[in-house]
């Protein structure tokens, strides 16, 4: 079988990948999983190999590459590509290869009941869709191809597309040997697309695994991959297929097949009856489709039912391949629902699968939190921050003349031909496109910050302007918002990248999330490459005592409340930007009365003489009291500033020392009055330190998204032991492993999970007691947050425990089956 020239999609599996390429292997696997795919066949890589070796093209390619590509400049790639591709075009197809392709095309016509069916001819390179390398459109696709001779020529042209300048440059950037690159070609029945698009089973920008992102446009899908139209975007929850986010873009043009002209035509989507009549005069068949389906520039290109059906298919694809996937799809107006939804391609999502986002992103330092003038806003497409001089280029030729290393490339859109110039850029800004456009995908892979879909960047930004592009927030600022220290660190990206890459391979993935505790914002630079999923506890007390130094009520009295807000926001943003998009759970202040008194100006406001501040006026009881509520509002405003003004939506909050539901309800109301409310991207947690939160966990769970166990305080209050008493500790009373404490944790997890809330732990216990970690994992805790020095050790321990649990369950299952 390995030497066959033609294979049909329904006889292909991933085992034949070297013969059929990634695209075809993915299609074959989807067919096996019962997923709707247009019928077709594959001209295998064996046919390509015979063509290039029997005609002498292979030797010609080797000679051209050695002689032409010397320094890696874009012009060298262009010259080599032109020579090689013209050689393909001039070389006739050997008769036996032509016969094999024609016979398969005729058979496809018989299968679909059309003598000369319209087909899509798509490249399927043998390394194109592997997890290690996403070529995202590096080779060509030809749509609505009809007739035997045309199909044969397009197969040959698809083979030649293995040698475009962009493909050559891309393989070099990933150190892929050109001699190992082979090309298969997929020939499929053409879909008559009413709508088409791309979807990811992981959020392509934030890496959230519980979301599906669907982008769609009218007509054929080439305009979404090429970024020629800014697509509609739908974000769907995997758990219940609820549509979480909808963004309808203006889609003023589309590509449709015109049967009267037998070619694809670009149309202006009509907004009025007059424009529809004009379209009917030029392209009557296309106008009929536009009118029948209510196609308008501002109308949604998908119905709610279609969004959910696409999401359902996406989950089915991900489950079959057992990894996040990047999927192309189309809706055929010639078919009836639900058979009209067809999947055209599925390949492994590459960026988050390699876990290189943290290493490749360039997060701002403390001083680099953007405060400059906002010039342009768009869709955040590739995370990171970079500064440079603007070069506006509307064509590849213009980019070739203007671009220098480190420039900010500004253009209407970037298709695959732009890759050599994207590699030269420090950042990319486009007028059009969405987060799944080709430009966004490649920018993420290359680690280049990108903002797409701005609408007018090419008009607002001028050549030579110094700007800062924040790809995480979708904003372009005036000037270079960076420090020299940040520049020096970015000049040595290989250090952080190397550490992150090593860690991603050495330390295992766990079902139980491993978070890290952090108190000093400056420490994040030392620890950001550790293998943790987020900050499970960010204490702000250090920021207040060291960065601010004053009692917040004193600052309010002096009219300097904004100073408190800004400094607290800076400290939080430093951490959140450094690990974006991983979450940062910020705990509101939890000073005791005596600690607040030590702040400058504190004596005036902390007059309460408490014998035991540990269980006194602290936590939420302080936030809702008139004597401190104005200060709490400053904390809330700082969080709002970080999330809304600076776009760091990965910042969540946590209330400490919660005693009752009514006090939490009042604190949440204050937060809402300041413009912060729980939502899909804003989680609210509470600390579990007081036994009342354990017993009433099911009630608290209706008000919050998660719980975090403060095991030190919880142990103190469950056992009635002063945590600071060395005398009682020596007697063995203070022990987080005490059965009463463990039972409290068990009750909490059961009650929280029954209401859909998550449970974490941020106390010292897991860092000290391995047996406590095992207890927590076996009880189903969602995450464990530990100090930086324990992250690696606890992650390994959790992975080991989870493996043991899996083996135990398999043994139990085997035992049950043996008794049947």
From Swiss-Prot:
Catalytic activity: pyruvate + ATP + H2O = phosphoenolpyruvate + AMP + phosphate + 2 H(+)
Leftover remarks: The reaction takes place in three steps, mediated by a phosphocarrier histidine residue located on the surface of the central domain. The two first partial reactions are catalyzed at an active site located on the N-terminal domain, and the third partial reaction is catalyzed at an active site located on the C-terminal domain. For catalytic turnover, the central domain swivels from the concave surface of the N-terminal domain to that of the C-terminal domain.
GO BP annotations listed: gluconeogenesis
Name of the protein described by the UniProt record: Phosphoenolpyruvate synthase
Alphabetical UniProt keywords: ATP-binding, Kinase, Magnesium, Metal-binding, Nucleotide-binding, Transferase
Gene3D superfamilies xref list: ATP-grasp fold, A domain, ATP-grasp fold, B domain, Phosphoenolpyruvate-binding domains, Phosphohistidine domain
GO molecular-function terms, A-Z: ATP binding; metal ion binding; pyruvate, water dikinase activity
Pathway: Carbohydrate biosynthesis; gluconeogenesis
Cofactor: Mg(2+)
Residues the entry annotates as binding Mg(2+): 689, 713
Domain of life of the organism encoding this protein: Archaea
Residues reported to bind substrate: 539, 587, 689, 710-713
NCBIfam families per UniProt: PEP_synth (TIGR01418), PRK06464.1 (NF005057)
Location of the active site: 438, 762
């Amino acid at each position: 079988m390995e030497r066959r020239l033609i294979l049909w999609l329904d006889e292909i599996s991933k085992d034949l990948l070297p013969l059929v390429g990634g695209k075809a292997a993915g299609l074959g696997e989807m067919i096996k999983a019962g997923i709707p795919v247009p019928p077709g066949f594959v001209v295998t890589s064996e046919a390509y190999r015979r063509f290039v070796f029997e005609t002498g093209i292979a030797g010609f390619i080797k000679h051209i590459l050695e002689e032409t590509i010397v320094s890696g400049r874009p012009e060298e790639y262009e010259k080599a590509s032109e020579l090689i591709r013209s050689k393909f075009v001039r070389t006739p197809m050997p008769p036996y290869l032509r016969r094999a392709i024609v016979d398969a095309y005729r058979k496809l016509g018989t299968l679909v009941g059309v003598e000369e069916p319209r087909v899509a001819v798509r490249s399927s390179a043998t390394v194109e869709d592997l997890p290690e390398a996403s070529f995202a459109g590096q080779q060509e696709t030809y749509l609505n191809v009809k007739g035997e001779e045309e199909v044969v020529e397009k197969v040959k042209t698809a083979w030649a597309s293995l040698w475009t300048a962009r493909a050559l440059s891309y393989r070099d950037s990933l150190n892929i040997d050109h001699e190992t690159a082979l090309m298969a070609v997929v020939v499929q029945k053409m879909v008559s697309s009413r709508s088409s698009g791309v979807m990811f089973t992981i959020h392509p920008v934030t890496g959230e695994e519980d979301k599906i992102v669907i982008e769609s446009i009218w007509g054929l899908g080439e305009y979404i991959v090429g970024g020629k139209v800014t697509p509609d975007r739908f974000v769907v929850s995997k758990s219940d297929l609820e549509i979480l986010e909808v963004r309808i873009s203006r889609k003023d043009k589309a590509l449709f097949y015109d049967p009267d002209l037998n070619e694809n035509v670009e149309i202006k989507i009509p907004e009025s009856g007059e424009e529809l009549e004009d379209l009917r005069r030029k392209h009557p068949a296309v106008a009929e489709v536009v009118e029948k389906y209510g196609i308008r520039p501002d109308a949604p290109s998908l119905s709610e039912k279609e969004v959910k059906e696409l999401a359902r298919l996406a989950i089915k694809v991900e489950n079959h391949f057992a990894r996040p996937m990047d999927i192309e799809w189309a809706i055929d107006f010639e078919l009836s629902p639900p058979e009209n939804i067809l999947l055209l391609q599925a390949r492994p999502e590459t960026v988050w699968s390699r876990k290189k986002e943290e290493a490749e992103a360039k997060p701002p330092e403390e001083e680099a939190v953007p405060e400059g003038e906002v010039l342009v806003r768009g869709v955040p497409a590739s995370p990171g921050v970079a500064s440079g001089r603007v070069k506006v280029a509307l064509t590849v030729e213009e980019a070739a003349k203007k671009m220098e290393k480190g420039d900010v490339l500004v253009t209407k859109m970037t298709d695959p031909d732009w890759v050599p110039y994207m590699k030269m850029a420090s950042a990319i800004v486009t007028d059009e496109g969405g987060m799944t456009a080709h430009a966004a995908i490649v920018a993420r892979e290359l680690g280049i910050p990108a903002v797409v879909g701005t609408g007018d960047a090419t008009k607002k930004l001028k050549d030579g302007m110094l700007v800062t592009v924040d790809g995480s927030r979708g904003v372009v600022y005036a000037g270079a918002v960076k420090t020299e220290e940040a520049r020096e660190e970015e000049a040595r990206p290989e250090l952080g990248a190397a550490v992150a890459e090593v860690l991603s391979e050495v330390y295992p993935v766990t079902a139980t999330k491993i978070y890290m505790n952090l108190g000093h914002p400056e420490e994040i630079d030392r620890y950001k490459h550790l293998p943790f999923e987020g900050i499970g506890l960010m204490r702000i007390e250090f920021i207040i005592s060291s960065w601010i130094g004053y009692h917040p009520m004193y600052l309010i009295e002096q009219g300097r409340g904004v100073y408190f807000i800004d400094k607290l926001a800076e400290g939080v943003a430093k951490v959140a930007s450094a690990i974006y998009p991983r979450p940062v759970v910020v705990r509101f202040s939890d000073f005791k009365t005596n600690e607040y008194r030590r702040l400058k100006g504190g004596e005036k406001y902390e007059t309460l003489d408490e014998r035991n501040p540990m269980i006194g006026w602290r936590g939420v009881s302080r936030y809702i009291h008139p004597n401190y509520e104005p200060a709490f509002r400053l904390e809330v405003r700082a969080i709002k500033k970080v999330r809304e003004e600076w776009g760091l939506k990965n910042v969540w909050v946590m209330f400490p020392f919660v005693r009752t539901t009514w006090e939490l309800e009042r604190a949440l109301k204050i937060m809402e009055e300041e413009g912060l409310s729980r939502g899909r991207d804003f989680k609210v947690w509470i600390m579990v330190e007081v036994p009342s939160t354990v017993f009433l966990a099911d009630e608290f769970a209706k008000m919050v998204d998660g719980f975090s166990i403060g095991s030190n305080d919880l142990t103190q209050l469950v056992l009635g032991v002063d945590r600071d008493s060395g005398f009682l500790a020596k007697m063995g009373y203070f022990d987080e492993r005490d059965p009463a404490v463990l039972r409290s944790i068990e009750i909490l997890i059961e009650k929280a999970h029954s209401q859909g809330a998550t449970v974490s732990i941020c106390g010292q216990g897991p860092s000290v007691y391995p047996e406590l970690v095992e207890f927590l994992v076996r009880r189903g805790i969602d995450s464990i947050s530990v100090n930086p020095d324990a992250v690696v050790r606890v992650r390994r321990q959790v992975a080991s425990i989870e493996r043991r649990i899996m083996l135990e369950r398999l043994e139990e299952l085997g035992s049950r089956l043996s008794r049947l």
